[in-house]
Amino acid sequence: MSLIHSEKYVVLYNPISNEGHLDSWHVLFIKMLTQAGFKIIALTSDPIALRKKLYDVDQTVGSTSAQALGQGLIVLGAEPVGLVQKFGRRLSHYSTKTLDVLFGRPKRRVTHLEPSMLGQQLNALLVRYPEKIGLVLNMYMDAYDPAPEQWKHFRLKTVVPLAGVCITPQSGYSEGYYGLPFYRGTCFLDDTWREAYQAKFTEKYFEYLPDVTDTRLPKTPSALLQQILTFARDRKIVFMGGSIGKQKNLTRWHQVIAASDLEQWCFVQIGRINRNNLTEGDEKSLTLQARQPRENLFVHDGYVEDERIFNEIISHSHIIFAVYRDFTRSSNMLSKAAYFEKPIVVSTEGVMGKRVNQYKIGLCVNPDMTQEIVNGLSTIEQIANLQDNFRLYRNDFSLEMVQAKLVRFIEQSVGTLG
């Protein structure tokens, strides 16, 4: 059974909105699948933001017109089911928080979403659109508690194929959702993971998706870019951005800034700082920066909702800093580097180091060696054949390739439902 030009919908669910990577991919997936002939229900916790990203001022998204999108696209908000449940959850959250304060309990950090919530949201959708859902693709299976007991009682009112995207597998093949007979498979951003999981779960279907990115630019220069260019003057701009937590290696970033020539280099940091996810060294660096702001560091501590502005800043930078700590997976920053032809400096570890070494689009450095990173900034633009290297990377990590793989994955997932 094919869902292309079918009356049934593919549900694309992004469970965590206002996170750059996922928001970007949600829009790209909608565009790709609509162009391929699928009808889409886009489920999100922030439908207003998604609509804003989909429909530009000129009412186009890429080469897909707003009219074409409207004919095959429904955008819905994912909300708790029912007013009583909403009230109960809010009351429970308030009570727990109040008791924690009164009795001095340590703060509880939520690390995963509950599979039961996913089940409630999907069942509400199945009731609203009976016999109209052909497949559900969850954009971030990493977000859910992988423990088998959490998935033991997961049920859907109507059995439909369920599949997902997994950015960072963490459970050693023990994710509970693989025990669901209607869970058909997973897309990974690393082919090594695809091969490993396919060997483990031969009855499921797995696909590798190149980590591509939105590369659109605004029609007119943004106010944020103007501020940065004024601040930078004639200095070379080193860009670091995205959701900023401990993996961004803030401690080393600040040390590199301190060790660099004030008159030659300007460092630009764009993105919301996740202060609940920093190392002690990161916190000390931020405290020092607040007390003694560096003359060569521009900081925008906030989520840039319009990715075109994020891209615009990269396009005016000279080098991308992505020397992440304990970060083994892919990053769409590599695709941004290749598309905007900006050499990127990364850590030697993980998928990013492997790809930069393979395609020669930047340098790999030790994430703990400040001087090695500083030296790399001075030599990175001397890499031979950089433009050809960028072109090769773009060919292998193209939107067309992702679209073909995604379509194949969906068709296979539907076709293999027993």
How would you label these PLM feature ranges?
Residues 11, 228-248, 254-257, 267-268:
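Conserved donor-binding/catalytic core segment of Leloir-type glycosyltransferases
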Residues 13-27, 144-145, 248, 328:
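A short, glycine/small-residue-rich beta-strand->loop->alpha-helix junction that serves as a flexible
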Residues 21, 368, 381-415:
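A charged, aromatic-enriched C-terminal amphipathic alpha-helix characteristic of glycosyltransferases
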Residues 48, 241, 266-284, 299-303:
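Glycosyltransferase donor-sugar binding loop
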Residues 161-172, 181-224:
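Donor nucleotide-sugar binding/catalytic pocket of nucleotide-sugar-dependent glycosyltransferases
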Residues 280-312, 316:
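Nucleotide-activated donor-binding/catalytic signature segment of Leloir-type glycosyltransferases, i.e.
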Residues 312-329:
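Acidic donor-binding loop of glycosyltransferase active sites
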Residues 319-320, 341-347:
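Short hydrophobic beta-strand element within catalytic cores of glycosyltransferases
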